[in-house]
């Protein structure tokens, strides 16, 4: 503890920002780094109070700037084009794109989803796993499956009844335990992202990341009048405040539409 200095802490924070993600080797998000700084501040303050270390002013450490990325989602016309392209595609694995559009699943949750996670009678799916691309003990690329990073990410999502017949047919043909499978082969996150990118290129739709499917689901849900608490639970957010903050523009547009309808009574 005596060797710990503000300079060492600052270097540590820089390392976290540049290569702190042990899964990807890339930097941690600014919000994640700032959370770590808060824990450090609390721990070091307590150590000082207990006489275990000298006082270190963590509050003087330069923090990474946080900025809310604009929410990217597809228009209704683009969504329809994507759906038609998926339904005309002979590869069953592509149906996962539609499943994301109507459940808000993250790509890792989608690829980790097994047939045993779907209750066809109740028309709902259980999210209890996620996956990401990593390396095995020999340094070879592989897909790693684990538990979601938060308890709120573990959830049960109702499936629109219109999707059930499609899922039943795909299950009959499937030789994989995964809903999005390719026989005995495991589909990596990157390869599925690439399949989605190629679909967008073929349809001449402006490129958005795979996460835009989740944002599109949230946007459509708001447009249909879903309340923020229900949407938050379906998305697996820790609390409705996160949902409201992220989709504040969509909620405002929804309010404006209702107010304009009300104005027509004049």
Language model feature labels by segment:
Residues 71, 86-88, 144-154, 180-187, ...:
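Short, contiguous acidic/charged loop-to-helix segments that flank catalytic cores in large enzymes
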Residues 81-85, 136-143, 224, 245, ...:
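DNA/chromatin major-groove-contacting recognition/catalytic segments
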Residues 160-206:
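Active-site/catalytic core of tyrosine-dependent DNA strand-transfer enzymes
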Residues 112-169:
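Conserved tyrosine-mediated DNA breakage-rejoining catalytic core shared by Y-recombinases
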Residues 31, 49, 98, 102-109, ...:
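C-terminal catalytic core of tyrosine-transesterase DNA break-rejoin enzymes
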Residues 69, 73, 131, 164, ...:
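Catalytic-site neighborhood detector that most strongly recognizes the C-terminal catalytic loop/helix
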